[in-house]
Design a protein with these regions (language model features):
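Glycine/Thr-rich beta-alpha phosphate-binding loop at enzyme active sites
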Residues: 78-88, 107-156, 191-199
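N-terminal active-site wall of soluble small-molecule enzyme domains
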Residues: 36-99
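Glycine-rich phosphate-binding active-site loops on the catalytic face of alpha/beta enzymes
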Residues: 11, 86-96, 128-140, 171-204
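Catalytic domains of carbohydrate-active enzymes, especially glycoside hydrolases
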Residues: 25-40, 122
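Hydrophobic faces of well-ordered beta-strands that scaffold small-molecule active sites
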Residues: 7-13, 37-39, 67-69, 84-86, ...
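N-terminal amphipathic alpha-helix/helix-capping segment at the start of soluble metabolic enzymes
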Residues: 1-24
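Alpha-helix-loop-beta-strand connector modules within alpha/beta enzyme cores
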Residues: 50-69, 95-112, 140-168, 201-204
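Catalytic cores of alpha/beta
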Residues: 28, 67-82, 96, 111-124, ...
Length: 204
């Protein structure tokens, strides 16, 4: 996985896809700040995810953004997406690799270096840690810190993705402490004060 320091945003989809979503996504991608886009839809059927995924994949391809699927290796394979993100309750990376081959596989490690070491043994391509702040998207069960990033950097040179309540007021400290990508969702899609494009433009 290549790391582009100027494209440090790992954008996660809203849970509900509104009509305005696709035009908002294009505007965001035009800023050239996004390296990854993860499709995360919990309450849609496989068929619905497939239809939505095909549209998003085209947009991602046009802007050279890697298209990842949350949790579902079979949807990843069907869409021929660039990769899949796996949680701790999902299939492990080695088993996922048997299904989707040499695609990008990222693994949630919460705040645990022990889980990170296991993910590395299972050949994960990147490690995701969090939550670093309170989140509008998920209830915070695990609290990560800057020290989590520092410890992770000592055991691997794989990219580190940080997640959890990241916004324009708190993102810089994470980058200064060598997080490679900022996973953002609620700040963009649930922001009551700004449109998605204005929110992304606050992150320089």
């Amino acid at each position: 996985m290549k790391i582009n320091k100027k494209k440090f945003i790992y954008l996660i989809s809203p849970l509900k896809i509104k009509k305005s979503f696709y035009s908002d996504l294009i505007k965001i991608f035009k800023t050239n700040k996004v390296s990854f886009f993860q499709l995360r839809l919990k309450k849609k059927s496989f068929k619905q995810k497939l239809i939505i995924g095909k549209k998003i994949k085209k947009i991602c391809k046009n802007f050279n953004v890697k298209f990842l699927i949350n949790d579902d290796v079979f949807l990843t394979k069907k869409l021929n997406a660039d990769g899949c993100h796996l949680g701790q309750k999902d299939m492990n990376a080695l088993d996922a690799r048997k299904i989707i081959g040499n695609k990008i596989i990222g693994v949630t490690c919460h705040n645990s270096i022990k889980l990170a070491k296991v993910a590395l043994l299972k050949k994960a391509d990147y490690l995701a840690f969090g939550a670093f702040n309170l989140s509008k998207t998920k209830k915070v069960k695990y609290k990560a810190s800057i020290n989590t990033i520092k410890k992770a950097k000592k055991i691997t040179d794989k990219p580190i993705v940080v997640i959890g309540g990241i916004n324009s007021n708190n993102y810089q400290n994470l980058l200064l402490n060598k997080a490679n990508f900022l996973a953002i969702s609620g700040y963009i899609w649930k922001n009551k004060k700004m449109k998605p494009i204005d929110a992304i433009n606050k992150i320089i």
